[in-house]
Amino acid sequence: MTKNISRDRHVAVLPFPFSSHAGRLLTLVRRLAAAAPNVTFSFYSTPKSIESLFSPAERVPGNVRPYAVPDGVPEGHVFSGEPVEHVNLYLTAVGEGESLRGVLKAAEAETGRRIGCVMSDAFMWFAGDLAEEMGVPWVPFMAGGANSITAHFYTDLIRETVGMHDIVGRENDIVKFIPGFSELRLGDLPTGVLFGNLESPFAIMLHKMGRALPKATAIAINSFEELDPDIIQDLKSKFKMILNVSPFSAISLPSSPPPPPTSYTDEYGCMPWLDNRKAASVAYIGFGTLATPPPVEIAALAEALEASGTPFLWSLKDNPKEFFPEGFIKRTSERQKIVPWAPQEQVLAHGSVGVFVTHCGWNSALESIAAGVPLIGRPFFGDHQLNAWLVENVWKIGVRVEGGVFTKSGTMSALELVLTHEKQKELRARVEMFKKLALKAVGPEQSSTRNLHTLLEIVAGYNL
């Protein structure tokens, strides 16, 4: 098949350089680049993102080249602590892609190759306009799930049906008109659809994304078809091509070697610690790169872990241990490990882990499913609420903490339910079922494998 690849193909890649978005897209690009070594992939991201993603340890293929774009942060700017503040600054600077046109031209001049395809994070909706101007395919990648695409694609329908005024207080209303969802709580729609600052750059970006996606040549989704079949069926009727391609790290592509064994750093010794724990007994706690519970909730979660006697591995960045109850670390020292970072996929795959206490970010939920581990969700923003709804009400593989925030009693109840209550057998059986479906999807000639091959054909310029 490689002989049919366009030898001077040049693919522009426009990530959303925050949270795990850019890393997830780069992982996909690396798979494609290894299978199409004659194709150049130009990866446009912020300096901070590039420094992290293109470190020597990452071993990025030589045909993937980084190009820095401004992050939009004014010199001397003092951040307020809002999770999406740096996102809004970047989006304001990028605008509708005007600032990227010069960088794209520079990459064309440097490589001597005209851009023949634009890949982007789906959030970067204006990439569709750039691709249209160049007369080339646009392939957005949704780092979240198909359910998020549905919510943003139908935003106008939702706003028209529900109304935009007096919406506060209606979070618990159940609606049944959104295609693909049998029902959904209004308060669990992603931020920017009905709730939150709808005039913020972030909310406007999501709304424009929903309107722009129909022009895409194909939409690649970080999921597998069997997880949300009703939603996928509806989306396939609305878009030109839907390609669920996960878990893509396990899929072999033509003309490239099989994926190497996963290498990871365990500098804090998480895995040896887990080796000494009983099967399915440990609560692994991690909230991603952007979400951190407020101090009162960190204290409540700590109190629940101590009172319940649950062994736990807690990945806690920025060292907010000052918020723990006095003496907590010493009293729990025999059954806990608290680290600033953990190799999450490997931790979840360890047999000692019995539950994942999470913010319900999409990658975290997907990794937990792939490992067969039930979840306890404490959603914060973005698609977290929607993912928590799916975990508890649709997939039935976990629970949301009572009231959506950590309290001592509510967290103890959730831990008991998932780890020791009779219901834990049902939760574990359900998540094990989805784990098997995920593994099947990446088998030979199965859904995610076929879709990733199709994506390679489109992006790398096979002569179809």
From Swiss-Prot:
* EC number per UniProt: 2.4.1.115, 2.4.1.294
A biological process term (GO) from this entry: cyanidin 3-O-glucoside biosynthetic process
Does the keyword Signal feature in the UniProt annotation?
Answer: yes
| Summary of pH dependence | Optimum pH is 8.
Enumerate the CDD domains for this protein.
GT1_Gtf-like (cd03784)
> Mind telling me which InterPro entries this protein's record contains?
UDP_glucos_trans, UDP_glycos_trans_CS
| Residues reported in the UniProt entry to bind UDP-alpha-D-glucose | A342, Q344, H359, W362, N363, S364, E367, D383
Provide the alphabetized UniProt keywords.
Flavonoid biosynthesis, Glycoprotein, Glycosyltransferase, Signal, Transferase
Q: Return the similarity comment.
A: Belongs to the UDP-glycosyltransferase family.
Q: What is this protein called?
A: Anthocyanidin 3-O-galactosyltransferase 3GT1
Q: Which organism is it from?
A: Rhododendron delavayi
